[in-house]
Amino acid sequence: MKSKFRHVALIGKYQTVASGASGASSRRVLEDIAHFLGAQGCEVVFEHDTAHNMGISGYPVLDVDAIGAKCDLGLVVGGDGTMLGIGRQLAKFGVPLIGINQGRLGFITDIPLDGYASALAPMLRGEFEEDHRSLMHARVMRDGRCVYDALAMNDVVVNRAATSGMVELRVEVDGHFVANQRADGLIIATPTGSTAYSLSAGGPLLHPSIPGWVLVPIAPHTLSNRPIVLANITEIAIEIISGRDASASFDTQSLASLLRGDRIVVTRSEHNVRFLHPRGWSYFDTLRQKLHWNEGVA
């Protein structure tokens, strides 16, 4: 049966051909998937950095903006980090994404590499589940002007430096003072990011359908300082009151150095990331498998 998606972009891990057997193996995987897509009636293109770094030739190559303008589907082969990076870039175009897991956990790249064809074939015919993930838009404000801005699908994290003491942070929500917090840092996580750093810091899991964020302190000085769930229509502002060499990271993929008095202002982005999953996909199945729930239970 002809594919529902005519133009499909392949995006892979950014390994270089100099990385030896691992790079060669990854290149073969991508080429095999491209051949499979072609057999399903898809016109395959490669994302520019993927093709360049993996040494792939013989297919059209497009940058991210061109993929957003011309492609019906993005197929991401890698781990969650690969998906986070391309998801932020393609969100404004509304291109749906399917993830094939070539990484470790794979919360958002949920199709196993082994046997991908049996999962992909019905999805290409239109048999899939779709869910949308919110993005955060973060700005670093210094003396009233924006000096850095970024999108985040997982989290925005304000951290102390590795060799310095705690930071003191002033937290406001929609202009209302919440508290001054002394801690190693503070995490603002989306439902997607609630299974990442936020979870390891004691934050709750948020179902992707919940229009919320979670604010999680990292090793707070006061034990009563607990995580709090907020509506994602709020504006969260974090001001650096004291502490040396603090920084803000966005999905752990970009970083901004912070000075005393800087404010990190976080709002919801107008764009969502569209994920496609195999028919019958369940968020709870993913949690159970990835977090090893029920293991050893008869």
UniProtKB/Swiss-Prot annotation:
Please tell me where this protein is predominantly located.
Answer: cytoplasm
Q: Which domain of life is it from?
A: Bacteria
GO molecular function annotation: ATP binding; metal ion binding; NAD binding; NAD+ kinase activity
Q: Which Pfam families match?
A: NAD_kinase, NAD_kinase_C
Q: What is its EC number?
A: 2.7.1.23
Query: Required co-factor?
Result: a divalent metal cation
Record-level GO cellular component terms: cytoplasm
Per UniProt, subcellular location reads as: Cytoplasm
The UniProt catalytic activity note for this protein reads: NAD(+) + ATP = ADP + NADP(+) + H(+)
Give the active-site positions.
Answer: 80
Q: Which family does it belong to?
A: Belongs to the NAD kinase family.
NCBIfam families (alphabetical):
PRK02155.1
By its UniProt entry, which PANTHER family does this protein fall under? NAD KINASE (PTHR20275:SF0)
Q: What is this protein called?
A: NAD kinase
Source species of the chain = Albidiferax ferrireducens (strain ATCC BAA-621 / DSM 15236 / T118) (Rhodoferax ferrireducens)
